[in-house]
Amino acid sequence: MEGYILDWANLLLRWLHVIVAIAWIGSSFYFVWLDNSLTKPTAPDLKDKGVDGELWAVHGGGFYNPQKYLLAPKQLPDHLHWFYWESYSTWMSGFALLTVVYLFNANVYMIDRSVFDMTATTAVLLALGFLVVGWLVYDTICRVFGKNDRVVGILVAIYVVIAAFAACHLFSGRAAFLLIGAMIATIMSANVFFWIIPGQRKVVASLKAGEKPDPIHGKRGKQRSVHNTYFTLPVLFAMLSNHYSMTYAAKYNWAVLVLIMLAGVLIRQFFILKHKGVVNWGYPAAGVAVLLGVAVWLAPVSRPAAPVAEAPAATAPAAAAEGSASAPAAAGQATAAAAGGSDFAKVQAVVTARCYQCHSAHPTLMPSPAKGVLLDTPEELGKHAQLVYQQVVQQKLMPLGNVTQITDDERTIIAKWFEGGAKTN
């Protein structure tokens, strides 16, 4: 029942997170477009009111004329709409989802002992540290070098590269990618919470008090808002990357992450300039070139299957990480015993020894079968043959962190079975 409840929490939080993220990104992209599309007003009355830019647009059968004031209107309207709950709700739902999926299952999803051996508690603390330290470093860079946008951009980019390298050498690949995305998303939402909204509140307070607002608040808010728009596409990739293991499972996965994020920034730059009337196809061309280069770099190389050892070396799997049950002690004997049987019998022995801990009706490493995938019957194993082959043989992602210590010989057993037609009889 606990696993069932967590699955529903995962579903509902993920749904909520996507909905509010669409609202936040949509409003952010709209205002970046609006800011860069404004034209100087020609009507004297608009100039007298302090309007610095305006735009005429048509949408949904109606005409719109948004106007932006150089600093603020002389008199505030009775109702003033604020844009901040989109940001806050996106971060809160995202952190809740991170907690339910990753922090509650650190042994399974965050730790890869072939990368860095640590306890679940250490993994959780390090993950939280990435979020906090990421914001503190970024904010310090902006405070110290804020008057020079180029220097800020270079230093922030360098920090993201360092953070990506560190994360990929501490956590499992999928967790590392997600944490870098969460770190940048935390920076984005913290920009709204600590700088953009407080600055706007100070401007409003000054106007209500009959004082002239300090323009520095608008400048700081605009700078952080611009940073956020460049962060958006890299964060979206990091959040989607968990579905594409060829990226986070690569040998130099940190470089893959950095390069794809760079492609996102280049593509975003094209649209930002286009809003200003400047069309430079070099930016998207460079972004696409980077993506194609990464795709070619990561392309799998077809090799003939190696001959299967007559009696594969199979040792009893090590105990799973802290707080989880150990794999069956007789796993090695079961695998070796199947060495002389049919291809499918050998595969069943390997799956029983190495995969049942997460993919059976009664898993021992988690409350319910991971991703709802069961491998404890011939029918289920045959149905998921393609997935097993991809995850275990081609990408070597499973078992997660190789917690059950599957051997290369055992992976070859699965490869030979699948490439021979994945027969279950």
Where are each of the predicted segments found?
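Membrane-interfacial entry segments at the cytosolic side of transmembrane helices
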Residues: 147-154, 249-253, 274-289
